[in-house]
Amino acid sequence: MRHYLLHGLTYLLALTSAALVATHVHAEDDGLEVRIGYLAWEPARGPLLSNVIPEPEDAGLRGAELAIIDSNSTGRFLKQSYALSAVRTGTPEALLTQARALHEQGIRLFVVNAPAKELLQLADAFPDSLLFNAGSASDELRGEQCRGNLLHSLPNRAMLADALAQFLATRRWQRWLLVTGETLDDLAYAAALHRSAGRFGAKIVEEKPWTFDNDQRRSAQAEMPLFTQASEYDVVLVADERGDFGEYLPYNTWYPRPVAGTQGLTPTGWHKTVETYGAAQLQKRFEALAGRWMNDRDFAAWIAVRSIASAVTRLKNADARAIRTLALSADLPLDGFKGRKLSYRDWDGQLRQPIPLVHPRALVSTSPQEGFLHPVSELDSLGFDRPESTCRQFAAAH
């Protein structure tokens, strides 16, 4: 408890000093200029065992750029302007060095697309700043490793797994065969699926680790049916975040069953096929800017910047502490083109949001599913609810 209180006091003192300096905002006669830092580093994925379509190298960055354009479009009427200082590095050490340089220039608002370890280093290095996590789905970042100055615009694995489990429950596909890869991310995704199975009454009839090191492009039709032999199941769930083998499970299972998880029917924060509630206009504007489809990291960066801009519009300043306080209140509903107002949970900083369930070229459904009720918000049926949260930094620093 003493450890959490010390973290909270350090955070509050740092933000108070930042409020006195507030060098990231230039209040001039002609308006307010808000500078936002974008920090990105992604470790090498290593050799893949399939020819999976790679993630765009500018994933996330283009979403932040579009949000700056959108914010300036509305901000000019209020004499507010927004500028993005983007940093993409090849090493985590360079990321911290470049972030320090932006911090020395007075920037106190950051959108970060980086793994959990680097996010924690940045959050601890800049306690007077407000960071938005737009790149890591780590459940630990929303739990015991949370930080009071770190909000999360990207859904975590628990939210994704719950969204999928709710849909499977509505279809009464409650017997799962779980196939898990060997990476730490795969194991974390599998752990989230185990948690969701317990929450929504599913049974994992068998869990099979994928330990093969061969390319499945030529042998999937022969090997996958034998590998997926097991007790009767309704659906095959796959935890393969890198894409080593999961793409070859659909249509190759022992029983003719659907595949879901990281491949097949996939829960995600955003997808090209999301078009309702004005989303089609956002998709078109993004494609005109980036020349490609908008993905979940692009949307996470976009909504993070829009969160800042929406708060600045209400506050008429860009103080990091004030933005955090407003974001965690009920007074900053955000329009994310998902059919519901989005908001940040005040117990762990996670953005509440509906989760699309998609396959590569179509939207299948959106969770939370009808009938999954909650006393406060149905969106809180996805992920860690207040009673089960292990995050203590927000209680100390709120």
Where are these regions (language model features)?
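Extracytosolic ligand-binding ectodomains
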Residues: 3-8, 23-398
